[in-house]
């Protein structure tokens, strides 16, 4: 999965965001496992996945804060 753009994330529903976070967490787990066994070729993908998760969580929190105001 390529780096996610904020515009794409903002267009997602909360359920889609939850699904995206879950799939990114699974991907991160697999990437960490590959790194530990020496099979990981694209080491920057670990950082991208971590930041994508943070980006989605941030936008989800902003959406929730906007609904409560």
Swiss-Prot record:
Keywords: Ribonucleoprotein, Ribosomal protein. Coiled coil: none annotated. Pfam families: Ribosomal_L29. InterPro entries: Ribosomal_protein_uL29 (IPR050063), Ribosomal_uL29 (IPR001854), Ribosomal_uL29_CS (IPR018254), Ribosomal_uL29_sf (IPR036049). GO terms for cellular component: cytosolic large ribosomal subunit. It comes from the Bacteria. One of its GO terms (molecular function) is structural constituent of ribosome. One of its GO terms (biological process) is translation. The keyword Translocase does not apply. HAMAP family: Ribosomal_uL29. Belongs to the universal ribosomal protein uL29 family. This is Large ribosomal subunit protein uL29.
